Regions:
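Alpha-helical transmembrane segments of multi-pass small-molecule/ion transporters
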Residues: 1-278
């Protein structure tokens, strides 16, 4: 959870008037990007989980990943892929706010559906989920934005320091979970890896199609592909393992596998893009 707070604080520092001005500058790109993240991605995840007949706990875990906002590291990947970084920041910020409300709604529908399909009763404490998301997502973003507004020079220095430790810390968290649940991961790696990879790749393909419908330029298309392909796995881990919500380390496993594969797939994508643009 502390890592998630740091990431959201950094996102708040990144926010600026230019980021929100991007909504007026390119509203179609913002709208289609958000549709890809908030609507299309959960549909893909549900389809993947259903087709692969995931167990209820893994079904919920994969859906949880798909309902989370874009990952903050997507801004860095957009820059590396020579995308529209301002659009990336805008989509990440807006999706982080919107999913405060869409995540509980979608997960409530999913929990009922999974219960009906499996016969296993799943209770989702929506109120606690909403409160935790406000505390872990919205409040740190707000504090980061206010810190940047009133102490801009100090904010830039803090950003440089935290940016260097945030991503390694996230990977360390994933590895710690990996070690704690290594037997479960080894036993289920084939299906978990396949489901996570399928979610990422199908999401990237669909977002590429969406961006082509919008007739965007290459930088905008690449940004939308990355934004839809990179979700905030840390938030999914925090929700799944929270003692106030699901209190299930096993439910966090799809997010852990997703985080590892997401970086491999997106780094490969960025490498191919940079080769193409040479």
């Amino acid at each position: 959870m502390p890592i998630l707070i740091v990431l959201m604080f950094l996102l708040g520092i990144d926010l600026s008037k230019k980021a929100f001005a991007n909504i007026a500058r390119n509203p179609k790109a913002v709208l289609l990007g958000l549709i890809g993240q908030i609507v299309v991605l959960p549909v893909i995840a549900f389809g993947v989980a259903w087709l692969l007949e995931l167990s209820p706990v893994y079904f919920m875990g994969l859906m949880l990943v798909s309902c989370c906002p874009g990952g903050s590291s997507s801004n860095v990947f957009s820059m590396l892929a020579k995308g529209d970084v301002a659009l990336s920041v805008t989509l990440t910020a807006l999706s982080s706010v919107i999913t405060l409300f869409t995540l509980p709604i979608i997960m409530e529908f999913v929990s009922v559906s999974v219960s009906d399909m499996s016969g296993v009763e799943i209770n989702l404490p929506i109120g606690k989920l909403l409160v935790q998301n406000l505390v872990l997502i919205f409040v740190p973003m707000l504090i980061g934005g206010l810190f940047k507004h009133y102490f801009s020079n100090a904010a830039e220095k803090v950003k440089k320091v935290l940016s260097k430790v945030a991503f390694p810390a996230l990977m360390t968290l994933a590895l710690v979970f990996f070690y704690q649940y290594k037997s479960e991961i080894i036993d289920n790696f084939a299906v978990l890896g396949l489901s996570a990879a399928a979610l990422i790749l199908v999401a990237m393909l669909c977002s590429s199609g969406i961006s082509r419908i919008g007739k965007f330029n290459g930088s905008v298309r690449r940004t939308i592909v990355i934004e839809v392909g990179m979700q905030n796995a840390d938030q999914a881990i925090a929700i799944a393992s929270s003692p106030f919500i699901f209190n299930s380390g096993e439910m966090a496993l799809p997010a852990i596998i997703y985080a590892l594969l997401m970086n491999v797939i997106l780094l490969t994508y960025v490498y191919c893009i940079r080769l193409k643009l040479k």
